[in-house]
Amino acid sequence: MEANVGFLTLCLAITLVRFLMKRYWHQSKINDKNNKAIKQHYPLPPTPKGLRPWPIVGNLPEMLMNKPTFRWIHKLMEESNTQIACIRLANVHVTPVSCPILSREILKKQDATFATRPLSISTFLITKGYITTVMVPFGEQWKKMRKVITSELLSPMRHKWLTDKRIEEADHLVRYVFNQCNNDEGSGIVDLRLATQHYCANVIKRMIFNQRYFTEEMKDGGPSVEEQNYVNAVFDMLRYIYAFSASDYISCLRGLDLDGHEKIIKDCIKLTRKRQDPVIEERIREHQKLGGNKVPVDLLDILISLKDASGQPLLSTDEIKGQVNEMIMAAVDNPSNAAEWAIAEMINQPHLFEKARQELDAVVGKERQVQESDLSQLNFVKACAREAFRLHPVAPFNVPHVSMADTTVGDYFIPKGSHVMLSRIGLGRNPKIWDEPLKYKPERHLKDDGSGVVLTESELRFISFSTGMRGCVASTLGTSMTVMLFARLLHGFTWEAPPNESRIDLTEADGELLLAKPLFALAKPRLPAHVYQT
């Protein structure tokens, strides 16, 4: 058996090498012709020390031997003392960047040049063949869907229209945590990862479907096992969108699923769409039955009711399904990750809790809960969330940008087709930008003049919500969700390490940037009992 496997592997390798050699030499001739003029004046970004690209495959062998890839890349950049690098994976120049000046040039000055996305089997499957928005290459489909998102779903008017749904879920979150403090066990130990992730999922599902759960909720208001599996599948898709699969750089490997990513994505899609698609299909039938006269109550109604110039549905059923899935993915991870990390850090620095509660009590008092109208006055609370975005980003890199033409960035030549990745870790923890970059210090974000703190970072010293032509169009929603989640948890409860633990272990997971262990913390109500029942 082992001999057969070895023989098949050898045959595959020989076939692959022959295919790649022909493609490589053909592409090299084209690249040499197109790039010759610019390359005479500007070099490629530096190759990290110790890396020498192999013919055809580049540094793919090193990538495959050094997992997780994002930690390998950041280690190479640190050892080479560079804020921009060029790592060739097969015939693709991968360019990680951790300098805010270069990042601003990419996302602001040259955002039109870097306005497309890389192709991968994961993004193809998740977007139903590139018919959505965030992960879709630049083109007419992207323009169409982005217009729908910005003008119909995320406009200021629509944001206000959906306020009650967001507040309902914030109220539900507080009741759920309160129930954990008063359950039969009486322990008050709360799984904050579960609470924060499901709050975010519940908010976006309420906005899209006008419902919290696809299955029955538990007696304490929490999610069922089926609901937890659904949300876990959403997070698994986020983990594998741009996971440095070999097939992302050598297209002929797609379908072989050598690293198992394709199966994981397909399984996640099957699970999530098992819950989402029947709701969407039933709603479409309802609209058809009412002849397009249904009064909209959520974003799904809006998507279905859109018409083109001839009065026909603007979006196909697949476009609606794909966009709904993408909106859910876009909403769940950033706020929940920031809140979990911030509370973990603050448990180890209790004086930060005290300062945040003083602000909350001064603005909100103790006879009601935090409302969205309060958020603009909660500068220290927002500084705590902002610091979590800086120090503990949800992903190591921003969504990759692909250069649509040869260009230069910071006196470096960036060939057409390069994958440019802004490092959230490298920017937010850059010692050339931040004092004590590895310390959680919310006060660094407070302004001397007392002006309002915002979660966005226009100078790209860190990335909370991306900017530019392919930037995050939901930063207002993301800010509301993040600050409301965090403020409700801080205002309603005190938080401590569980009994027999003096501190929270802040170790990162090896393969991602979440806490290595989900945050379990001891919660105690700090408001009058009647406030929790609203």
UniProtKB/Swiss-Prot annotation:
MF term (GO), any: heme binding
Binding-site positions, heme: 472
Tissues expressed in: Expressed in seedlings.
GO biological process: secondary metabolite biosynthetic process
Signal sequence, start to end: 1-21
Residue positions with a glycan: 500
Keywords of the record: Glycoprotein, Heme, Iron, Metal-binding, Monooxygenase, Oxidoreductase, Signal
Catalytic activity from the UniProt record: L-phenylalanine + 2 reduced [NADPH--hemoprotein reductase] + 2 O2 = (E)-phenylacetaldehyde oxime + 2 oxidized [NADPH--hemoprotein reductase] + CO2 + 3 H2O + 2 H(+)
Required cofactor(s): heme
Iron listed as a keyword: yes
Protein's UniProt name: Phenylalanine N-monooxygenase CYP79D16
High-level lineage: Eukaryota, Viridiplantae, Streptophyta, Embryophyta, Tracheophyta
